[in-house]
Amino acid sequence: PARGLLTFVPVFLLSIYGMLLAPPGAQAKRLRGYLVAVVALHWVLISFYEDWWGGHSFGPRYFSDMTPYFVYFLIPVVARARTRPALLVLFGLLTAASFFVHYQGAMRWASYAWNVEPVDLNRAPSRLWDWKDPPFLRSLRP
């Protein structure tokens, strides 16, 4: 949870749905296949990094280059949401959750200090998997 793409940008869950939606036209279908392949290849490549978590950072640092791809795949979802109120509400809730997480990282020092407190992340990378202490909730603790 400490570096997960979908933990830090929950609205990108809908991008996965957008990857499955069939775009109109043969060229768009080919483009979709290429873009999905780029995202998948990127994911596989960074998985082989020794410090796949990106060191002292906030969020999925190595996935930041993929943001335009995930936003592209939100386009058909947003288009479909105009006629499906439940999808529009889900989009709004996931977007709000995404903003909340990034607000914590941008405005709360405790979220960034998570990398070194209580122990340096690079010495104890097992902390990345601790659901009881995600960095974006650190500032909410008493």
PLM features per residue range, with description:
Residues 1-5, 46-64, 108-114:
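Membrane-interface catalytic loops of GT-C/OST-like multi-pass glycosylation enzymes that act
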Residues 1-23, 121-142:
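Membrane-lumen/periplasm interface segments of multi-pass, membrane-embedded glycan/lipid transferases
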Residues 6-29, 70-77, 89-96:
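Hydrophobic, aromatic-rich transmembrane alpha-helices
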Residues 19, 23, 47-50, 81, ...:
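Transmembrane helix-loop junctions and nearby membrane-interface residues
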Residues 28-40, 80-107:
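Signature aromatic-anchored transmembrane alpha helix within multi-pass, membrane-resident enzymes
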Residues 30-42, 50, 54-60, 64-67, ...:
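Extended hydrophobic/aromatic segments used for targeting, binding, or gating
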Residues 57, 90-142:
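Membrane-embedded, lumen/periplasm-facing catalytic core of multi-pass transferases
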